[in-house]
Amino acid sequence: DNGIVASASLVADDGASSTGGINTDTGNDVTTLTLGYNGDGWGGGLVLASNDGDVGTVGYDAFGLGLNYSPESIPATISVAYDTKDPEGTANDETDLFIGVDYEVGPGTLHAAWNTTEVDGGSDNLDISGFEVSYSYSINDGVTITPGFFTVDDGEGEEDTGVVVETAFSF
């Protein structure tokens, strides 16, 4: 469906506790606002989030922007997302960039994505990057299989690599 999509939420981490509460100075609260638009062949969204950090955790403000485009000339979707996180106090800011492509190949879709996170003010070993590749295809009307692999560089020269097989059922 095309059109505007929006949401707002308030999550109280300590809402179940009588000493924490909801939206109080004795509990942590996270407020999130989203606004997006879906059009023919494209879409985008904006996310604003804030953690007040009142108790035990560092508060932060976060901003995210994402766009996707599906050109009519090729069977693909290109997605780009940019996110920032600004913690209170002396904690280091984070910037994240994601680029993904979905391309119809044969009976399924090939997915490829790259992501990098840069931690400002910290050492380079806090920066991480990685990529993933997968292929999804339907086994029948209700089952989709998606095998894939990923690798993530932790910034210290170590890589975590894995193989994944997801099976999705629809009834």
PLM-predicted stretches and their roles:
Residues 1-171:
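Outer-membrane beta-barrel proteins
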